[in-house]
Amino acid sequence: MAEITSAKAMARTVRVSPRKTRLVLDLIRGKNVADAIAILKFTPNKAARVIEKTLNSAIANAENNFGLEKANLVVSETFANEGPTMKRFRPRAKGSASPINKRTTHVTVVVSEK
């Protein structure tokens, strides 16, 4: 049986737009996990907090479930898929209303050994 060299973590239905989340994910894809955490710490973005927690979860999964070394881990895959959209309405002039879409995101982070 082949040895497992990667671990995954997901954050589902996060109240951040997928488009804004992808901008942050592009910064850490392919980086060493220590560098990725440092980048996320200094990124002034709501999505960065969520991605940092998900990345730490993936690292913990790799260490505890598969016995991988944190020093050897790289962020191999990251993606943000669209979750369910909460539809709201904003009252406007003359009794009309405009739709407001509050988007959510499913964030996935995969770490693997170099």
UniProtKB/Swiss-Prot annotation:
Source organism superkingdom: Bacteria
Gene Ontology molecular function: rRNA binding; structural constituent of ribosome
InterPro entries per UniProt: Ribosomal_uL22, Ribosomal_uL22_bac/chlpt-type, Ribosomal_uL22_bac/org-type, Ribosomal_uL22_CS, Ribosomal_uL22_sf
Record-annotated membrane-spanning stretches: none
GO biological process: translation
GO cellular component entries: cytosolic large ribosomal subunit
UniProt keyword terms in alphabetical order: Ribonucleoprotein, Ribosomal protein, RNA-binding, rRNA-binding
CDD domains documented for this protein: Ribosomal_L22 (cd00336)
Recorded family membership: Belongs to the universal ribosomal protein uL22 family.
Assembly: Part of the 50S ribosomal subunit.
Known function: This protein binds specifically to 23S rRNA; its binding is stimulated by other ribosomal proteins, e.g. L4, L17, and L20. It is important during the early stages of 50S assembly. It makes multiple contacts with different domains of the 23S rRNA in the assembled 50S subunit and ribosome. The globular domain of the protein is located near the polypeptide exit tunnel on the outside of the subunit, while an extended beta-hairpin is found that lines the wall of the exit tunnel in the center of the 70S ribosome.
Protein name from the UniProt record: Large ribosomal subunit protein uL22
Originating species: Streptococcus agalactiae serotype V (strain ATCC BAA-611 / 2603 V/R)
Encoding gene per record: rplV
